Amino acid sequence: MQNKRESYTREDLLASSQGELFGPGYPQLPAPNMLMMDRVTKMSETEGDFGKGLILAELDIKPDLWFFDCHFPGDPVMPGCLGLDAMWQLVGFFLGWVGGKGKGRALGVGEVKFTGQILPTAKKVTYEIHMKRVVNRKLVMGLADGRVLVDGKEIYVAKDLKVGLFQDTSAF
């Protein structure tokens, strides 16, 4: 694997969406508009609440982001499912970062709680992912807990985020 670092820029994340960051066969992040972060500020295999990995990432909020125009006209708010997807994206990114190969797919989440919202007046969303387990056998799978914060205030909590890496997704 190439380009294993502790942080990544927007340009790095865009390279990941094209399969160019870690190399052939490694999981890709989605391309814009579904890429839900601007940078990864920290990657660690040993930190986090469970000592199995920590990912910190950020999204700069701008009033002209695509989802504010359609969700909802006259009452713009970032869809909660996009924050959840960002957490899945980061778990998959972590799996590639630790050497896992395959195509990333979200496999589920145990529990999600929304206690706030992301409005166009916000400045920054922070994603915090605490890895609980990584399985690297025939199936590569990550299990994590995550939080979403807007301007420093926790607004979503997700328990047991699951992402798998698959060599063949035709039967998925």
Curated annotation (Swiss-Prot):
Q: Which GO terms describe its cellular component?
A: cytoplasm
Record localization: Cytoplasm
Chief place where the protein resides: cytoplasm
| Reaction catalysis annotation | a (3R)-hydroxyacyl-[ACP] = a (2E)-enoyl-[ACP] + H2O; (3R)-hydroxydecanoyl-[ACP] = (2E)-decenoyl-[ACP] + H2O; (2E)-decenoyl-[ACP] = (3Z)-decenoyl-[ACP]
* An example Gene Ontology biological process: unsaturated fatty acid biosynthetic process
Annotated active site residues, numbered on this chain, are 71
Its EC number is: 4.2.1.59, 5.3.3.14
- Pfam families reported for this sequence: FabA (PF07977)
* Record key words, sorted: Cytoplasm, Fatty acid biosynthesis, Fatty acid metabolism, Isomerase, Lipid biosynthesis, Lipid metabolism, Lyase
**Record's InterPro entries?**
FabA, FabA_FabZ, HotDog_dom_sf
A Gene Ontology molecular function term of the record: trans-2-decenoyl-acyl-carrier-protein isomerase activity
Q: Which domain of life is it from?
A: Bacteria
Read off the HAMAP family from this record: FabA
Quaternary state and interactors:
Homodimer.
| Annotated function | Necessary for the introduction of cis unsaturation into fatty acids. Catalyzes the dehydration of (3R)-3-hydroxydecanoyl-ACP to E-(2)-decenoyl-ACP and then its isomerization to Z-(3)-decenoyl-ACP. Can catalyze the dehydratase reaction for beta-hydroxyacyl-ACPs with saturated chain lengths up to 16:0, being most active on intermediate chain length.
Q: Which family does it belong to?
A: Belongs to the thioester dehydratase family. FabA subfamily.
Its name, as the record gives it, is 3-hydroxydecanoyl-[acyl-carrier-protein] dehydratase
Q: Which gene produces this protein?
A: fabA
